Amino acid sequence: RRIAMLEGLGYIYTPSKNNSFLKKNILKHAHGLLASIGYAFANKVLFLNQDDLVDLAKNSFINSKKSKVIGPIGLELSSYPYTEVVITKPVRFIFVGRMLAEKGIFEYLAAARIVKLKYPNTEFVILGGLDHDNPSALSKDQLTHLISEGLVNYVGNVSNVSEWLVKSHVFVLPSYREGFPRSTQEAMAIGRAVITTNVPGCRETVQDGKNGFITPLFDEEIMAEKMIYFIENPEQIISMGNESYSNAQKNFDANKINPILERLIVGGS
């Protein structure tokens, strides 16, 4: 059996603020043709979210009977044990990911500026590396300036992401598109509320108003409003974090997900 699994559709399906619509449209058709050929002999084509399946189907000839949405691949939850939030001042928000426009780094920074006008002691942590070869990336000079003005606490690439999640109050991922973000799953497993965007892959992780907030794409003002809500209502950091933990236990346990994948691989439906 041949199984294809797409963990996301990548750059050409990701919205952007520049005028790249025509270019991406052409690339979508080219990608769809290649996908039609490449997956023609696959018994199953697996997707992590429904939008990816629908969007690729619009631009390809993949047999719909082969396509299936499986949701998150999941985590070894014991590696991300629940740790109750300790509500201390200042409130600390955390971004984990490459510092690219498509990951929402610029919206995160813009929201931080808005929040700090009202609550200047609020902390904004960034985990992740610079991407010097990507034109949409935050530059080293920009980062140096942000650090010097005290806007962010830049940690860089680390091997102990979970420890930083534990030390933070709210996880923020303003991404433009995802498959099913592992970083959000990790934060939820530990018991952290989430602020994310209303885009494929991200909106599947949050029940708006229950374990966090879903904000419009590109809208740093609404994002800042939600951050301020947590600052002014710290009890919601705990209750929404607990809801995240509950969702993670139900939906992100690799020990429950792996047998389902195994059945698909060996011939089940």
PLM features: residue spans?
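Nucleotide-sugar donor phosphate/pyrophosphate-binding loop at the beta->alpha transition
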Residues: 1, 11-38, 54
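Donor nucleotide-sugar binding/catalytic pocket of nucleotide-sugar-dependent glycosyltransferases
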Residues: 32-82, 95
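A conserved mid-protein helix/loop that constitutes part of the nucleotide-sugar donor-binding site
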Residues: 91, 95, 100-114, 124, ...
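Glycosyltransferase donor-sugar binding loop
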Residues: 96, 123-138, 154
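Aromatic "clamp/platform" in nucleotide-sugar-dependent glycosyltransferases that forms part
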Residues: 157, 176
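Short hydrophobic beta-strand element within catalytic cores of glycosyltransferases
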Residues: 193-196, 206
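Conserved acidic donor-binding segment of nucleotide-sugar-dependent glycosyltransferases
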Residues: 207-209, 213-220, 229-235
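A short, well-ordered alpha-helix in the C-terminal region of glycosyltransferases
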Residues: 222, 229, 236-251, 257-263
